[in-house]
A protein has these predicted regions:
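Phospho-regulated, low-complexity intrinsically disordered regions of nuclear gene-regulatory
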Residues: 2-26, 50, 56-135
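A short acidic, leucine-rich amphipathic alpha-helix
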Residues: 40-41
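Short capping segments at the starts of secondary-structure elements
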Residues: 30-36, 49-50
């Protein structure tokens, strides 16, 4: 049974909370060709303020004494979305064998928000490079 609340998709027995279309729509509106989850969040929370509020209530922000925060959730969703054949992102390379191919060190400001010294960097596919949607 599906439960819908303010545009946030919640499925019983499933981990889908935000619809994939919302993920794709927000990635298209990120003004950079390469971006972090923090850049994505800046766009997502402006486009979907109620969804953002619900996600923060569910997962919390960094510093709220939770291991799995809203930034972790959305970063994981971007990772999974990047591997879909229709994704507008290049497939994200996960950390392996002490290699941080698609990661970079966080700035001091980013670390205060994100918590980790490393942050994933997502890249738009070349054919979508200049195709920024307008919402």
């Amino acid at each position: 049974m599906d439960i819908r609340q303010a545009g946030v998709e919640v499925k019983m027995g499933s981990k889908t909370i935000v619809e994939e279309e919302e993920i794709e729509e927000a990635t298209k509106n990120v003004p950079k060709d390469t971006f972090t989850v923090l850049d994505f969040i800046d766009v997502f929370k402006d486009m979907h303020p109620e969804d953002w509020k619900n996600l923060v209530e569910r997962f919390g922000l960094f510093g709220s004494k939770r291991r799995y925060t809203v930034t972790t959730y959305l970063s994981n969703r971007l990772d999974v979305y990047s591997h879909k054949p229709y994704s507008t992102l290049t497939p994200f390379t996960r950390y392996k064998e002490a290699k941080f191919k698609d990661y970079r060190r966080t700035t001091k400001e980013e670390k205060k928000i994100f918590g980790s010294p490393w942050i994933a960097v997502f890249k738009k596919k070349l054919e979508n490079k200049n195709a920024h949607a307008v919402y």
